[in-house]
Regions:
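N-terminal catalytic cores of NTP/NDP-binding nucleotidyl/phosphoryl-transfer enzymes
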Residues: 1-8
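Short Ser/Thr-interspersed hydrophobic loop/turn segments at strand-loop and sheet-helix junctions
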Residues: 11-18
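Feature 926 captures the class I aminoacyl-tRNA synthetase adenylation module centered on the KMSKS loop
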Residues: 19-57, 61, 80-81, 85-395
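Structured mid-domain segments that build the active-site/substrate or prosthetic-cofactor binding neighborhood
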Residues: 67-70
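Transmembrane helix-loop junctions at the membrane interface of multipass transporters and ion channels
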Residues: 74-76
Length: 395
């Protein structure tokens, strides 16, 4: 624990410096203390903890291991152990991981396909979705390796969690029909190959953190040329030929628009199965607009809208009302506050949007110059066209 900073770690440092004139170690990973769910130390007499054997039988060793490694306890901080926390890890990370593997195995067995992972050695996939999956799988290797090289165990798991989410909630969901097709055409073959490579890469990258599940997956995915265990494999090195930052930017841009669109639907209780006339995307970034235009079909399908409309100004869709922030301006203006409130209430939509974008607006109040910003002015929308569509501000 952290108490060893002045104990064993200190002793080693002093001895090494005195006897050998060099550091005892270059890096030191220190764990914190795992407390019971009530915040007290785990105690046999209090029985304030779950029996480890019962916890492993209930959740599996991987879930408990990942719960601890994906916490601040690996940064020498205290952590409260709870069955609920382990259950959350199981539901949000490990089950989705297994579901993606199960999806692949189920359909690969039905179609009697046996990917090798070599299809894209000399040529990239023709489908952008497959090329994107290969790219983010290589980025996964780079990000996790960088965190491990920095001895940052907690941060090393973040890219794995994100990748599992991307794999399930974007790639597989958007590719299902390709696997469902009856004919084994080139597109279907490439989809199997891309998913196979992604799963096998994920097994190798995540093996130090999720040793048992990744081993089970690997044993069924490996070919006759592979090592007999994932834990005997070299840690993967990214294939630079598969990395495509531009494609990742495009997909991230579309995902951002889709995510905000879904959020707006939830806000106004509009189920995704309910078709809408349009979605309005507000962006001033030329590159983002180009990407969104190219991926318009994907956006329409994801948000279940008939049309995608682009705007450069949010005030083309929404009208605003401005009010003075009396708490902030009152101290500055005193008796001029009432006059200022009237002037702020008369601000135009263009002036309000300028303030929302971080600009300052100078106004005269009885000869005194006052600069208005987002802290001094409270803004709220008073009208929007949500009846036939949804509007997404993209900056």
């Amino acid at each position: 624990g952290l108490d060893q900073t002045r104990g064993w770690f200190y002793t080693l440092t002093v001895l090494a410096a005195h006897l050998f004139d060099k550091p005892a170690f270059e890096n030191c990973v220190v764990n914190g203390i795992v407390l019971a769910s009530d915040g007290r130390k785990m105690s046999k007499s209090l029985r304030n903890y779950t029996d480890p054997v019962e916890a492993i039988d209930k959740f599996g060793a991987d879930a408990i291991r990942l719960f601890l490694m994906y916490s601040t306890v690996v940064k020498a901080d205290e952590i409260r152990y709870s069955d609920e926390g382990v259950r959350d890890i199981l539901k949000s990370i490990l089950i989705p991981l297994w579901n993606s593997y199960s999806f692949f195995v189920t359909y690969a067995n039905i179609d009697k396909v046996s990917p090798t992972g070599k299809l894209f050695d000399n040529a990239l996939p023709s489908n952008p979705l497959d090329a994107w999956l290969l790219s983010i799988s290589q980025k996964l290797i780079k990000d996790v390796s960088a965190a491990l090289d920095a001895y940052d165990l907690n941060s090393a798991i973040d890219p794995i969690v994100k990748f599992i989410d991307q794999l399930n909630n974007w790639y597989i969901r958007r590719s299902r029909r390709r696997f469902w097709k009856s004919e084994n055409d080139t597109d279907k073959t490439e989809a199997y190959e891309a998913l196979y490579i992604a799963l096998k890469t994920l097994c190798k990258v995540a093996a130090p953190f999720i040793p048992f599940i990744t081993e089970e997956m690997y044993l069924n995915l490996k070919t006759s040329e592979d090592k007999e265990s994932v834990h005997l494999c070299d840690y993967p090195v990214p294939n630079e030929n598969w990395l495509n930052e531009e494609l990742e930017f495009k997909m991230a841009t579309v995902q951002k628009a889709v995510s905000m669109g879904h959020s707006l639907r939830n806000t106004f209780n509009l189920k995704n199965r309910q078709p809408l006339a349009s979605v309005a995307l507000v962006t001033r970034n030329i590159e983002e607009k180009r990407v969104l235009s190219e991926m318009e079909d994907c956006i329409r399908e994801e948000l279940n809208v008939k049309k995608v409309i682009f705007h450069e100004r949010e005030d083309e869709l929404v009208e605003y009302k401005a009010k003075a922030n009396f708490k902030v301006l009152g101290k500055e203006l005193g008796p001029l506050m009432k006059k200022a409130a009237g002037i702020i209430a008369e601000l135009t939509s263009e002036q309000i949007v300028a303030i929302l974008e971080g600009n300052k607006l100078s106004v005269q109040i009885e000869g005194k110059s006052v600069e208005l910003d987002s802290e001094k002015v409270l803004v709220e929308p008073i009208a929007t066209n949500y009846g036939v569509g949804i509007a997404v501000r993209f900056w």
